[in-house]
């Protein structure tokens, strides 16, 4: 566990050398690789290799986090809320003491971060103490033909042939402590280094994952599952599908746009396809029916226990009532968030301007302005304008007109209902469509009224509408929060003899299992590993498809079969393998260890047949997809010619 890190707060990683090398997924490092890429130096397409420490590339927004200890603080947190009369009062009291406990950690030691997380729907609370390192540099990235082989087509699919890995290095000050980026920093020397195994695995071999899974909803009620399906999941499917089609068309046409939009397209499409698979799996695996059966058993238990009946008699009627009360508006809010908050980047810029603190210290203002201006590096105004028009149309067709924000009235009255004309005018008259205009806004002595800018003005209208919609369901949401907490607690008490693991919440978790294939449907069986043979098969099958395009020199290297010590027992090269470990988003980059604590590979995906895994674990069907560490080392040494990195590893 001392070698396992949270990578950027959104992925996982593992330390593999005495000089702070970290293995994580290619898609976890994708944004960093993209930021350093240009048409002239296309590290996304061609890969990147640092031949020396001096060539390693800094990433100002990136950090790694080491867990030092955990502590149960449930009594202290709940004691602060014992006099709360409403759910909102309870939340305020709980949040307040959680923040205080976290701050106490950093006050005692400024190099530490304390975070209190809720477990079991807010029935328990635990403090995690971390040490963060903010100087993390890119060392090695394979070309996307390795790290993203299969792209969207193969995403969430098995069999898989993706070398989804990248290599970074942690830097520290001369005392080996955390420090912001400085050319004077030196490679970090970790407390523990994960050894690497070249022995591989067999069917049934022990395998465990260690990482930082983001979130699951394993104990959510059936009412909550229905809301998830028909609300946020369906909104994501509909809206992102429209937005991504526009992005993809232009990315395929222009290399500069492909680089600019690569990271945001990758992030967007990942959860878009996840939502599609989740909704299908919920139906196919009868998740709702199973959850309702569990709820029926709980109803019987409540009826059979008078002391429980007194407390929980209205539990299910309250959940049903309040989920019903917010159903329509919650669905509209889901579309609102996808179409506007996560839609056109002009709106996102305007929202950040509205939140800009002009009274902050000069250093903070300059830093914030720099970050805002950097957003234009990955923005194409013509594409964003097309996206905005598409988002306006999509939202209008998906929700009742009473949920339309004020700008639709303007479109009707001033533009005769012509959305495209409105958008053309908006982008032509707003000053924040360019860095130059934004600079003018953010100068301290500006006399320009920000609200007079049409993009900022409409964003203010959006905030007002969003707040209004949220407020109208606040009471129902409070009752649901309380109901889900009581439901979670009741299920655990009904099965008091069982151990219930808590839902994922971005804290470190271990999952143990075995390497094993599975049967996706009747009459079919999938093996537990893939080899480079499948790369050639997919390249041939998908000839002309950019998702499966591979450089001739890589194909030549693979066809030479010069696998050396990285070959399996048959002399072939394993690429990926699967296990029945339990993972979710955030586990990407998680170390996959054998029983001796040696690294077998990195987890990077789940399988399509069990996409409802955030709601229910299906042991016979659910699989963790990992990239074999031997393939990683082969690519580093043979393709990247980076033998210097191989020498840093503890290979067994």
PLM regions and their residue ranges:
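Terminal presequence/propeptide segments associated with secretion/organelle targeting
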Residues: 1-652
């Amino acid at each position: 566990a001392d070698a396992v890190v949270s990578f950027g707060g959104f992925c996982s990683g593992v330390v593999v050398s005495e000089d702070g090398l970290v293995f994580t997924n290619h898609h976890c490092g994708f944004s960093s690789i993209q930021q350093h890429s240009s048409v002239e130096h296309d590290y996304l397409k061609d890969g990147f290799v640092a031949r020396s420490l001096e060539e390693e590339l800094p990433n100002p927004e990136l950090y790694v986090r080491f867990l030092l200890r955990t502590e149960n603080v449930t009594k202290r947190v709940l004691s602060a809320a014992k006099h709360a009369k409403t759910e909102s009062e309870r939340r305020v009291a709980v949040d307040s003491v959680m923040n205080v406990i976290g701050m106490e950690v950093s006050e005692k030691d400024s190099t530490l971060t304390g975070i209190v997380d809720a477990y079991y729907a807010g029935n328990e609370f635990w403090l995690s103490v971390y040490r963060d390192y903010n100087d993390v540099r890119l060392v090695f990235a394979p070309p996307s033909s390795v790290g993203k082989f299969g792209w969207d087509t193969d995403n969430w699919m098995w069999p898989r042939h993706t070398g989804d890995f990248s290599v970074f290095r942690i830097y520290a000050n001369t005392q080996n402590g955390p420090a912001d980026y400085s050319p004077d920093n030196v490679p970090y020397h970790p407390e523990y280094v994960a050894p690497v195994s070249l022995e591989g695995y067999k069917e049934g071999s022990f395998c465990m994952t260690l990482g930082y899974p983001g979130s699951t909803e394993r104990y959510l009620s059936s009412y909550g599952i229905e809301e998830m399906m028909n609300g946020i999941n369906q909104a994501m499917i509909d809206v992102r599908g429209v937005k991504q089609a526009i992005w993809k068309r232009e990315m395929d046409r222009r290399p500069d746009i492909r680089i600019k939009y690569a990271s945001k397209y990758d992030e967007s499409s990942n959860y878009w396809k996840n939502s599609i698979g989740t909704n299908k799996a919920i139906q196919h695996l009868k998740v709702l029916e199973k959850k309702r059966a569990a709820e029926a058993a709980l109803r019987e238990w409540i009826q059979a226990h008078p002391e429980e009946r007194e407390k929980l008699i209205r539990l299910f009627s309250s959940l049903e009532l309040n989920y019903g009360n917010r159903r329509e508006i919650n669905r509209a809010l889901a579309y609102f968030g996808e179409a506007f908050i996560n839609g056109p980047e002009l709106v996102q810029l305007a929202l950040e301007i509205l939140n800009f603190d002009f009274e902050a210290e000069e250093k903070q203002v300059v830093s914030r302005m720099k970050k805002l201006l950097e957003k234009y590096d990955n923005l194409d105004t013509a594409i964003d304008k097309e996206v905005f028009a598409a988002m306006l149309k999509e939202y209008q067709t998906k929700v009742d007109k009473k949920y339309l924000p004020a700008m639709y009235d303007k479109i009707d009255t001033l533009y005769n209902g012509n959305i495209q004309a409105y958008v053309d005018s908006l982008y032509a008259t707003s000053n924040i469509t360019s860095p130059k205009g934004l600079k003018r806004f953010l100068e301290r002595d500006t006399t320009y009224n920000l609200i007079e800018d049409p993009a900022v003005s409409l964003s203010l209208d959006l905030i007002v509408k969003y707040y209004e919609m949220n407020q109208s369901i606040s009471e129902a949401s409070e009752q649901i929060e309380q109901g889900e907490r009581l439901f979670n607690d009741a299920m655990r008490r009904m099965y008091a003899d069982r151990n219930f693991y808590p839902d994922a919440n971005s804290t470190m978790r271990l999952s143990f299992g075995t390497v094993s294939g599975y049967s996706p449907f009747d009459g079919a069986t999938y093996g537990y590993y893939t080899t480079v043979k499948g790369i050639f098969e997919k390249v041939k099958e998908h000839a002309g498809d950019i998702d499966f395009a591979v450089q001739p020199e890589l194909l030549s290297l693979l066809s030479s079969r010069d696998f050396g010590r990285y070959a399996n027992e048959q002399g072939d090269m394993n690429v990926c393998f699967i296990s029945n470990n339990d993972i979710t988003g955030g586990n990407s980059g998680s170390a996959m260890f054998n029983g001796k604590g040696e690294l077998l590979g990195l987890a990077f995906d789940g399988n399509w047949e069990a996409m409802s895994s955030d709601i229910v674990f299906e042991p016979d069907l659910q699989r963790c997809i990992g990239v074999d560490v031997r393939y990683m080392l082969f690519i580093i040494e043979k393709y990247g010619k980076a033998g210097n990195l191989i020498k840093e590893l503890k290979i067994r």
